[in-house]
Amino acid sequence: MNKNKIIRTRYAPSPTGLFHIGGARTALFNYLFAKKNNGDFIVRIEDTDIDRNVENGIESQLLNLKWLKIFPDESPLNPGNYGPYIQTERLPIYKEKAEQLLKEKKAYRCFCTPEQLEKNRKKALKDGKTPKYNRTCLSLSEDQISEKIKNNIPFSLRFKITDNTEIKWNDIVRGEMCVPTSALTDPVILKSNGIPTYNFAVVIDDNDMLISHIIRGEEHLSNTPYQIAINEALDINKNIVFGHLSVIIDETGKKLSKRNMELKQFIEDYKNMGFSPEAIVNFMYLLGLSSSDNKEIFSLAEAVKNFDIKKVSKSPTTFDFKKMEWISSEHFKMMSDSAFISFAKPFITIDLGFLKGNENDVILLFKNQIAYAKQINDLIDETFFSPETFAAVCEKFPFLKQADTKELIKVFIKQLQELPNWNISEIATVIDAVKKQTGKSGKELFMPIRVYSSHNSHGPELAKVIFILGKDKVIKNAKSFLDNKGA
């Protein structure tokens, strides 16, 4: 790596869909590599595939990057000196470079119709060959070209691949790579409507924006030799470095597909479910990387410090949603109570009923139990609004009907009634006093108190549940179950 050259990486999505976990990982790794090397991270939008662009596609990319706290040094929202940062605003630049290649006879006009090209493609497949352009238009004379232009026959511009050579690069993830030009075709660089193709526009952008390193998914491996060939023809991007990240697979071993609607894999999904951005960044960091000390919980700052592109795996990496949930739960546990309340509160959609006014205590009750904030709604319902019947709970735990259990609950009620201050510490003292007075412990102590006071056989920390329910409701609940026992 040239120590005197400023490291500049880029994330260059197309606004053809929502922000996918694969694209987000690419953005993160580019950000980490740049920041580890005191460089710049640039975001630009490659929107020249106009027919596939979706509404709000650009916003989904930029706003969700911001939510993840991956802040670019330059982007359409905070432009620097090397814009524009949206390709459709750069069309004259591409046209100029394409005309340069045409003038230097490194590109040529192609008048072939889509129907002709499709016919040739099918014939190649039928003959067992890889479809390639047959260079019909490369041999056109100047007079033939002039006649076609005069007759307004549409044409695209194709780049002429040099024959009988090899294109090589040292991939910082995969090592030495080599592709013979016999495996390539002459690619279209400018469509008949004047719109550049991906492989042409991207090299112009990378040069103009002084990009030093291109880190992207392995699906771009087939694009790299074309981009290197165009770079060489234009005499640009001489020292640019490529790195191709491993594919992300699902638990069945198949490549992650955006069409698999059963698997949530868009950043918007995680955001709406109530995952924290810190947890998602942490999870993405581990998609292809691991730490030498097996540490799995990282902050973004720690990820920058520890990032080493040479340790990125070349093998497929598995998207494990349960692992993401575990990482998220660990990040919630590390949050301060006030930060957790602020984060989780907007996700509470259940009618809190008698719990209103105790929202903060209710939210904190489940801090150590959730992977994403929306889960709190079900836990609130389960804990406070879905009581079990006395008959049902006694069927599971018959000892709850015994006389000594009834006496334990009466002691518990009496202790609560005499309690001067209603707080969690005092409630814990009451439970301890019941333990000493009755000689009960473990399940024989805590299960009756939980069931009689909350009408639920399981839930979060008992003293906290009792505190939130309130003295009057707890005593009322306990007495109603005693009545069901014929007391």
Curated annotation (Swiss-Prot):
Its main location: cytoplasm. It comes from the Bacteria. It catalyses: tRNA(Glu) + L-glutamate + ATP = L-glutamyl-tRNA(Glu) + AMP + diphosphate. SUPFAM superfamilies: An anticodon-binding domain of class I aminoacyl-tRNA synthetases, Nucleotidylyl transferase. Its EC number is 6.1.1.17. A motif ('HIGH' region) lies at residues 13-23. GO terms for cellular component: cytosol. It is found in: Cytoplasm. A motif ('KMSKS' region) lies at residues 255-259. One of its GO terms (biological process) is glutamyl-tRNA aminoacylation. Pfam families: Anticodon_2 (PF19269), tRNA-synt_1c (PF00749). It is an enzyme of class 6 (ligase). GO terms for molecular function: ATP binding; glutamate-tRNA ligase activity; tRNA binding; zinc ion binding. The keyword ATP-binding applies. Monomer. Catalyzes the attachment of glutamate to tRNA(Glu) in a two-step reaction: glutamate is first activated by ATP to form Glu-AMP and then transferred to the acceptor end of tRNA(Glu). Belongs to the class-I aminoacyl-tRNA synthetase family. Glutamate--tRNA ligase type 1 subfamily. This is Glutamate--tRNA ligase. The gene is gltX.
